[in-house]
């Protein structure tokens, strides 16, 4: 039986980064898919610590909060930088990813039609910090921090991929980010996952947007 279980809705949402991570690291996991109807009944929600999903199980350890799950996997699988300095930078990057993801989620679920144009116009300003970080690390030809992949790379990759769906061409003026996405997406296990039916057929969000 796989050591990990992801309990989540039938969307990519806040779990696709951890799925990409697990796939790239050669880990197996079980999916427990929760439909909106099941969630609406309230019995599962009442058992969730914060009343929300995802819920993640690693043996007898149960975790909530997607970024806590990513950090746990980072520590468990050696994806948290090579020292405390790099770990601090990985945390910083991941917090930046979360900031932009929250903006994206707000757009998708509260003001998509009326807010998309303004969001896309502001997007370059939100992407620039990641381009800057890449430029300061081996000329942008490695990972976002150091010379080994971290959980923040997987989270950033997922964030950039969904923004390419939202705004095709959004990375055209960010050559390092564009090359970064291509480079990570070409890693054999990530490439296989991104082309798998599980990923391709899973909607990004739960309301039909993207």
UniProtKB/Swiss-Prot annotation:
Organism: Nothocricetulus migratorius (Gray dwarf hamster)
Modified residues (N6-acetyllysine): 128
Phosphothreonine modified-residue sites: 62
Enzyme Commission no: 2.5.1.18
Subcellular location: Cytoplasm; Mitochondrion; Nucleus
Gene: GSTP1
PANTHER family per record: GLUTATHIONE S-TRANSFERASE (PTHR11571), GLUTATHIONE S-TRANSFERASE P (PTHR11571:SF255)
A GO term for molecular function: glutathione transferase activity
Record-given protein name: Glutathione S-transferase P
